[in-house]
Amino acid sequence: MLKQVEIFTDGSCLGNPGPGGYGAILRYRGHEKTFSEGYSLTTNNRMELMAAIVALEALKEHCEVTLSTDSQYVRQGITQWIHNWKKRGWKTAEKKPVKNVDLWKRLDAALGQHQIKWEWVKGHAGHPENERCDELARAAAMNPTQEDVGYQAEA
């Protein structure tokens, strides 16, 4: 039987683009591990993706995961859009390159053999874990220590 793990995520950006951060909580049998990191120049969507990626990459074996995010971009991207992006060679329906392709590929790889249930939660609506992740993300954004090397400014 697979281990049942809960993951909660959030990303934040002070300006978009601007300094950003992510926060994630990984919970298994009442034990929690938190993750957060700040980047000097990034976007909110990149930080939402990073939160999910880092938490999933921390799993050491195949798990049954419930991942809660307040990002429709992440949830819809991974459950609906990614299949066609991959078929089209990482291009959108308009034949444009997929934004944040470096992170979408990394998230796709991080899913591995996990069984994942994606749940959307309304942000800033009192969901305790989402609020904690938001606090982690905002604190990280205020003290960025990393460069988001994959971030590309709009032309």
Curated annotation (Swiss-Prot):
Top EC group: hydrolase
SUPFAM superfamilies, sorted: Ribonuclease H-like
Gene Ontology CC entries for this record: cytoplasm
Subcellular compartments: Cytoplasm
PROSITE patterns for the chain: RNASE_H_1
Cofactor binding note from Swiss-Prot or TrEMBL: Binds 1 Mg(2+) ion per subunit. May bind a second metal ion at a regulatory site, or after substrate binding.
Residues involved in Mg(2+) 2 binding: D10, D134
Keyword field contains Iron: no
GO terms classed as biological process: DNA replication, removal of RNA primer
Residues involved in Mg(2+) 1 binding: D10, E48, D70
Cofactor: Mg(2+)
Pfam families according to UniProt: RNase_H
UniProt keyword list: Cytoplasm, Endonuclease, Hydrolase, Magnesium, Metal-binding, Nuclease
Catalytic activity line of the entry: Endonucleolytic cleavage to 5'-phosphomonoester
Ranges for domain RNase H type-1: 1-142
EC number: 3.1.26.4
Subunit structure of this chain's protein: Monomer.
NCBIfam families in the record: PRK00203.1
Family of this protein: Belongs to the RNase H family.
Described purpose of this protein according to its UniProt entry: Endonuclease that specifically degrades the RNA of RNA-DNA hybrids.
UniProt protein name: Ribonuclease H
Native source organism of the sequence: Citrobacter koseri (strain ATCC BAA-895 / CDC 4225-83 / SGSC4696)
